[in-house]
Curated annotation (Swiss-Prot):
Matching Pfam families: PHD
GO cellular component: INTAC complex; integrator complex; nucleus
The entry's keywords: Isopeptide bond, Metal-binding, Nucleus, Phosphoprotein, Ubl conjugation, Zinc, Zinc-finger
Protein name listed in UniProt: Integrator complex subunit 12
Source taxonomy: Eukaryota, Metazoa, Chordata, Craniata, Vertebrata
Organism listed in the record: Mus musculus
């Protein structure tokens, strides 16, 4: 078994082994010279190992052989004549064998070769080739790694195109930055290709396709919330169209515009259509006319200009309703007498003692009885005075508005004196007071009707 193994070993190794075991005096010098020769040759030696030497199983066999030979050396050492020379030669041989073994350890770690101190020199010859190839491979790996790391660095810094991952810039293919996400795109890489006009215009703020989609979605989301309460507003508007809801709103507007006493009991529609029966008239007049009477007294004390304004407003307000035909001629005749006969100027000049006199009859006007008697007197006047409006116009009638004493002259004086005697006996108000108040009320009612119609038209629109 040992002979077969010896045939496969290196001849230089066998020669050195023979010198080691020899008992001659020159063996140590020859061994040293052989070691120097082998070191000088090194890789350039003519010996080339076969594949058998490199294979791991045969390496293990050589190891077993060297293990067998070691006891032989130890046994032969005491028998030698020159022990010191042999020991030095043995040390040199071991050092020479350890040097290539150390080199092979570094190279053969990747090939799973068991580590042993004694390995052949042929393996050291094959090792530089493997080292060179590994160097070449490592250089290639480093260059590729540098390229990839540069690309990654450019991508991390945001210097390269997001689509093609390159930093190249041409005349018609420049890098454009999205102002929202700050990604760079080539003009050709971006799906809707970016035109040169968009790139060169400094005023333009460019967004990529993804950001534009997101911004559109956000805009739609922000527009939707204000659209949701819109149906609630629409649902409120049909309730306004309801006639029951209209009335309080229009009444509030009337109170604020005319600045009368704030009473929600005022129902001008019932007052207008209330002359069909005397009971309805009296009940409506007591509640509604008390506030308007005080307001009319204030306006009548201002002078004849207010009467003229009321007559003008009454003429321009619109058509009279059929249900209120009994009252309206009274107001018209009263206004005609006051405007044509110039009675307002007479009242202001001769009959009124002081400007504070018209305020005195206000407390009795608020009583319910006075309202009843006034409504009755108005009905009497309307019944009596309707056939003779022409006689009232030319006839000069002198009337006192403040003191409560009244006297009428003219062809129809006997008919109107009855009504005035009733009113003067029951209250301190004159006949002129109710007729002027009625005319003002009629004018105000017509204005209210016109305003109601205008408000209804607006709501319908």
């Amino acid at each position: 078994m040992a002979a077969t193994v010896n045939l496969e070993l290196d001849p230089i190794f066998l020669k050195a082994l023979g010198f080691l075991h020899s008992k001659s005096k020159d063996s140590a010098e020859k061994l040293k010279a052989l070691l120097d020769e082998s070191l000088a040759r090194g890789i350039d030696s003519s010996y080339r190992p076969t594949q058998k030497d490199v294979e791991p199983p045969k390496i293990s066999s050589t190891k077993s052989l060297s293990i067998k030979q070691e006891p032989k050396t130890s046994s032969s050492l005491p028998s030698g004549s020159s022990n010191g020379k042999v020991l030095t030669a043995e040390k040199i041989k071991k050092e020479a064998e350890k040097r290539p073994a150390d080199k092979m350890k570094d190279v053969t770690e990747g090939i799973d070769v068991p580590k042993k101190p004694r390995l052949e020199k042929p393996e050291t010859r094959s090792s530089p080739i493997t080292v060179q190839t590994s160097k070449d491979l490592s250089m290639a790996d480093l260059s590729s790694f540098e390229e990839t790391s540069a690309d990654d660095f450019a991508m991390e810094m945001g210097l390269a195109c997001v689509v093609c991952r390159q930093m190249t810039v041409a005349s018609g293919n420049q890098l454009v930055e999205c102002q929202e996400c700050h990604n760079l795109y080539h003009q050709d890489c971006h799906k809707p290709q970016v035109t040169d006009k968009e790139v060169n215009d400094p005023r333009l703020v460019w967004y990529c396709a993804r950001c534009t989609r997101q911004m559109k979605r956000m805009a739609q989301k922000t527009q939707k919330p204000p659209q949701k309460p819109a149906p609630t507003v629409v649902s409120v508007t049909p309730t306004v169209k309801d006639p029951l809801v209209k009335k309080p709103e229009t009444k509030l507007k009337q109170e604020t515009t005319f600045l009368a006493f704030k009473r929600t009991e005022v129902k001008p529609s019932t007052v207008i259509s209330g002359n069909s029966s005397s009971n309805n008239v009296s009940s409506s007049v007591t509640s509604g006319l008390t506030g308007w009477a005080a307001f009319a007294a204030k306006t009548s004390s201002a002078g004849p200009s207010t009467a003229k304004l009321n007559s003008a407003a009454q003429n321009s307000s619109g058509k009279p309703a059929a249900s209120s035909s009994n009252q309206k001629p009274v107001g018209l005749t009263g206004l005609a007498t006051s405007s044509k006969g110039g009675i307002g100027s007479k009242i202001g000049s001769g009959n009124s003692t002081s400007p504070s006199v018209p305020l005195k009859p206000l407390p009795p006007l608020t009583l319910g009885k006075t309202g009843l008697s006034r409504s009755v007197s108005c009905d009497n006047v309307s019944k009596v005075g309707l056939p003779s409006p022409s006689s009232l116009v030319p006839g000069g009638s002198s009337q006192l508005s403040g003191n409560g004493n009244s006297a009428t002259t003219g062809p129809s004086g006997s008919t109107t004196s009855k009504a005035t005697s009733e009113t003067s006996s029951s209250t301190s108000a004159s006949l002129k007071g109710p007729t002027s108040q009625e005319s003002q009320l009629n004018a105000m009612k017509r204005l209210q009707m016109v305003k109601k119609k205008a408000a209804q038209k607006k709501l319908k629109k």
